[in-house]
Amino acid sequence: VAGLAAGVNSLARLGRAGRGGHRLGPGDPGAFGETVSVVVPARDEAGRVGACVAALLAQDAAVAEVVVVDDGSADGTATEAARTGARVEAAPAPRPGVAGKAAACAHGARVATAGRWLAFVDADVVLAPEALSRLLAACLAAGAAAGSPLARQATRTWWEELLLPDLGLAVAERLDLDAVADPGRPAAFLSGQCLLVRRDAYDGVGGFEAVAGSLVEDVALAGRLKAAGHRLEVRLAPGLAAVRMYGRFGDLWEGLAKNLAEVWGAGTAPLAWQAARTAAGWAPWLALAARPGPPARRVALAGGLLQLTVRAGGRLVAGADPRLAVAYPLADLVLLAVYADSVRRRRTGAPLTWKGRTYADAGGRRGG
């Protein structure tokens, strides 16, 4: 019964997130004469930043400049970015208690002044040629000061393919895009993978400098924009943006441990909710393994099949292989474990290492 109820709940939330109104619509390459300055914060992204910059230079929106902010890379990131055609700026060393990525974004915003809009795009993101124009059109149509497309996770390893689509479904279950878009409701979210913001709104809330101590600077900036009365637009765009954040399982674990407690919460209630979600996913299969009588067996089978349908549907929405939905119980267990580790680090102040930097105060002001 628990598995059946969880499946119905997940199906309803997936349908809400995936319906047409939350997908990025067509854009206008002219975008009403708007111009965009693009900032790419990059730390040790050689082998990725070139593709990112090439895609940005091919945008059909009015991209006025592409500035790559090299955040102390040691692998040739700056050389690759410059060779591809970007202007390269060196980020100042972050002050104690200041997140490296937030500091790099803030520096980029200071030096990229040609556009009326700012776009912050991670170096591991590749955008389709129409991505920025469609996002800009959505923001203009809604009267929004900022927006983000929710990108497809480009995966190569089995662990990435197993975990990241299920993580996306877990995020979709928590993320109410209607509430984010409603200026009368406090819910706020933007994705730093690709974040478009009007320059005057960005400056008006203090930009990334004002949230430089936050572990999740994109969500913190979204909160400041929403509190200042600005509208936000977040749309599904799996065909317009692709990101590959993690190359190894260890990187995946560290990256999620860095963020999950900040995004989902470090309290007992959200952790218990995730544990209950995991238990509900396992419940129908454990019940079937116990060989119950026919009525209970039918309920358990229905719950299990519904869970599989939801997970396969979530993978299709995310542009991932639906066949790996059969391994969702394992994915749920791993995600619960990494979330518990993230909460532990947040509560105890355990150090976190990310991109070669160690943030000792895990319970306070960290980031990267």
Question: What residues fall within each predicted segment?
Answer:
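Cell-envelope/extracellular polymer assembly enzymes that use nucleotide-activated donors
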Residues: E34-S37, E65, A220
